[in-house]
């Protein structure tokens, strides 16, 4: 099974990638949409032509990363495209942001 995986798919660039690729990409069987907000993923999936696997996961959470890893291992899809749009940012003086938040932001932006 050929799939497209999109993280951060519930809004912004992730959502837009899902919508645009759904219309123009015919060489894949399924889209895997990943984001924290499952209800938004369901809304997006309802408007898509392709089969969609909804994964309401928080990729900053190790248990949720395990769910994703296990899903990939179990189903063994061919990932034709990986679009990493999950992420967050903080505004303001970085010295006022706790180091845990800073490293969490970098970690998510690199892994997801």
Question: What residue spans do the PLM features occupy?
Answer:
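Conserved hydrophobic beta-strands of the Rossmann-like cofactor-binding core
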Residues: 3-6, 82-83
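Substrate-binding pocket helix/loop in short-chain dehydrogenase/reductase
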Residues: 93-106
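The beta1-alpha1 cofactor-binding region of Rossmann-like NAD(H)/NADP(H)-dependent oxidoreductases
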Residues: 56-67, 99
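N-terminal Rossmann-fold NAD(P) dinucleotide-binding loop
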Residues: 14-15
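Conserved glycine-rich cofactor-binding loop
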Residues: 10-11
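Conserved NAD(P)H cofactor-binding loop of Rossmann-fold oxidoreductase domains
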Residues: 85-90
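Conserved glycine-rich Rossmann-like NAD(P)H-binding loop of the short-chain dehydrogenase/reductase
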Residues: 25-43
């Amino acid at each position: 099974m050929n799939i497209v995986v999109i993280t951060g798919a519930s809004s912004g660039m992730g959502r837009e990638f899902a919508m645009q690729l759904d219309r123009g990409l015919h060489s894949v069987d399924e889209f895997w949409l990943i984001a924290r907000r499952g209800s938004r993923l369901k809304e997006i999936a309802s408007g898509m032509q392709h089969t969609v696997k909804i994964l309401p996961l928080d990729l900053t959470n190790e248990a949720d990363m395990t769910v994703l890893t296990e899903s990939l291992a179990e189903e063994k899809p061919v990932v034709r495209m990986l679009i990493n749009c999950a992420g967050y940012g903080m505004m303001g003086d970085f010295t006022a942001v706790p180091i845990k938040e800073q490293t969490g932001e970098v970690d998510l932006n690199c892994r997801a």
